[in-house]
Structure formats: structure tokens, C-alpha cells
Amino acid sequence: MDINLRDYCTADLDALGQLFYETVHTVNAVDYTPEQLDAWAPGSIDRTRWDRTLTEHFTRIAQIGDQIVGFGDLADDGYLDRLYVHRDFQHCGIATALCDALEEHARLQGVLVVETHASITARPFFEKRGYRVIREQQVERAGVWMTNYVMERKL
């Protein structure tokens, strides 16, 4: 399976929104309630905010052939904001390839620590990459509370 990583462009926005929704509602369903999933990924993204942050951040899109199979973005301060892989392409090395690219970019920018807020589902992936849990936290999305973890990795 040949994974191609490329830069984000605004034309990707609809595909990323759909991938985000489907991934959250399937992959994360093992760890979160339907109410939490609906609050996290309600079916439509804030297109203006997403496009702005995906453009401002270092964003990588993973493709296999013509299909977008994942994406991730990193802010200038080392905050890994989003990392999502298509539900049909889990455990294929896509998240690893995306994280490798994001972390290498951070290193080249002089960032010493990458931080993320990882879901219950994603925590083991990040732990295998050397991230450590700083704290568990309860976050509110659309009036619904859910657990995630502030995690960091020293580069």
C-alpha cells in the first residue's frame, strides 16, 4: 500500500469533514457514547474555522491513489491538533506516517515538545510513540462532557 503525503488545500475540506465524522462515529464508538460522538462530530464542521486552522497549521493529507485516507495538523507551537485516519484504513501505518511528518516538521522548526489532547481511543497509539500522559481531563462539547488526555512527547 503506497501512502502519499501532501499539503492541504481548501478543496480537501469536504472530504476531511466526512472522514472526520465517519471516523469518530465508528472508530471511537468503542470508547464513547452516541451522545458524546454526536457532540464531538455533529455531522457538519465549522468550515471557516477548519479551513483557517488547516491552512495556518502544518497540515498533511494522506492519500492512497486518489482517495484521502487520513490527515493531521500541527500548530506552530507544537500542538498536534487533529489526527484522523479513515475507518477502512486503520492499522495500515497511516497515522504513523502522518505523525512522523508532523513531528519532523516540529523538529525542523525548533519545537522541543509536541502536545496533543488524545481521545481514549488514540491514547495507546500515542503512548507507543513515546508520548506520556500529563493529565486526564473532562472536556465539554456542545453541552456534553467527555474524557481525553493531555499528552506530550519531547523531541
Task: Locate each region found by the language model.
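Charged catalytic carboxylate motif
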Residues: 15
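Extreme N-terminal starter segment of soluble prokaryotic enzymes
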Residues: 2-4
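C-terminal "cap" of GNAT-fold acetyltransferases
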Residues: 117-123, 129, 136-155
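Acetyl-CoA-dependent GNAT
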Residues: 7-10, 18-90, 99-101, 105, ...
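Short secondary-structure boundary/hinge segments and terminal tails
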Residues: 84, 107, 124, 143-144
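Conserved G/P- and acidic residue-centered "switch" motifs that form tight phosphate/ATP-binding loops
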Residues: 93-95
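Conserved GNAT acetyl-CoA-binding A-motif
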Residues: 106-119
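Alpha-helical structural signal in soluble globular domains
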Residues: 101, 128-129
